[in-house]
Amino acid sequence: MVDRRTLLLRIVQAFSATGALFLAYPFVKAWLPTFNQQHTLEVDLSDLKIGEIKQVSWLGRNVMIVRRTPEEISGLAEDKHELKDASSVHSRQPALAANQYRSLRPDVFVVYSNCTHLGCEVSASGTAASFNCPCHLSEFDAAGRVYKSAVAPVNLEVPDYQFMSRKILLLVKRA
């Protein structure tokens, strides 16, 4: 038989454990990854014509997908002396973008549309041959590489992605 003192002790322990669980729940929930948030996005490129830009929202950020013209592709090899980081050594990008095009395919360029200075939304300047930041007038070439005269410290950030087919692009968030 359990005496009164032991019974009260067990009741207090049970209430304390229950309270600790209720207190810990919000912290544990915040630390666990959100399973309802989609970490991949499939983008159809069949309607993207040469010289056009498609903008999609993914994981709370805007992503620009540019279909480059042959002139823009050939122009990427020129004027490297005007760029801060022409080889993209100091840029945030996956290994797939470690080339002069900063993309898997020379004709399709995928980039976050946030300036690397203060995060303003960059826009294409008439054509996709260059990007401009409206906040501090930083300029980027067709591969998102920043010019030396710009305020932005590094090139535009390239997300991780892969091609599922010639016309389907999959944006992927890797851990």
Region locations from a protein language model:
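N-terminal secretory signal peptides and thylakoid transit peptides that target proteins
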Residues: 1-15
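Low-complexity, intrinsically disordered Gly/Pro/Thr-rich segments
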Residues: 143-161
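Short cysteine-rich clusters marking metal-coordination/redox-active sites
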Residues: 115, 133
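Short cysteine/histidine-rich zinc-coordinating motifs and their immediately flanking basic loops
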Residues: 125-130, 144-148
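Detector for the c-type heme attachment site
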Residues: 136-138
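Helical transmembrane-bundle signal
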Residues: 16-26
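N-terminal pre-ligand scaffold of iron-sulfur
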Residues: 9, 25-114, 120-126, 155-175
